[in-house]
């Protein structure tokens, strides 16, 4: 399945905050192979749906590609994606926030297949874990005005699962 393979590709590349180039290069190449026109500023990547119309409101789908460095408690290689017996994907960034990036990208692709009453922009931002100056704020300055957004962390129950949920 392409989405799982994309997530595995993200996991297998170090993407620590302020050093996300390897994963940004990988995602840009994969999305371009899929026919997407990918825009880039630093390690921020975005795609604008082809039927963009300034007369419509704009929905931003956003999650981040950076991770924290692995803590000492890891019992397996954090950069070797592994599917567990209970269909979980193990690896650094699989949960925070690779799964969100892949899920929101897939949603963008599906929604972009037909005209919507709103514009769609998908943004995979960097430096979220450190609130870096080269992250989402620098990317937003390059985008058309955003009316509303689905952000991985804001909709935690949908796109960034944590232990806070039961």
Each predicted region: which residue ranges?
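Structured loop/turn residues at beta-strand edges in well-structured enzyme cores
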Residues: 5, 118, 144-146
């Amino acid at each position: 399945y392409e989405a799982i393979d994309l997530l595995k590709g993200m996991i297998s590349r170090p993407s620590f905050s302020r050093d996300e180039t390897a994963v940004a290069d990988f995602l840009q190449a994969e999305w371009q192979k899929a026919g997407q026109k990918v825009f880039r500023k630093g390690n921020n990547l975005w795609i604008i749906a082809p039927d963009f119309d300034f007369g419509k409101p704009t929905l931003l789908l956003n999650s981040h590609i950076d991770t924290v460095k692995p803590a000492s408690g890891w019992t397996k290689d954090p950069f070797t994606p592994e599917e567990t017996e209970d269909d979980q994907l193990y690896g650094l960034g699989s949960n925070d926030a690779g799964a969100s990036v892949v899920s929101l990208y897939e949603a963008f692709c599906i929604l972009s297949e037909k005209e919507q009453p709103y514009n769609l922009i998908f943004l995979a931002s960097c430096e979220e874990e450190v609130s870096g100056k080269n992250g989402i704020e620098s990317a937003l300055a390059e985008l058309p005005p955003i009316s509303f957004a689905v952000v991985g962390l804001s909709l935690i129950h949908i796109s960034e699962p944590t232990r806070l949920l039961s």
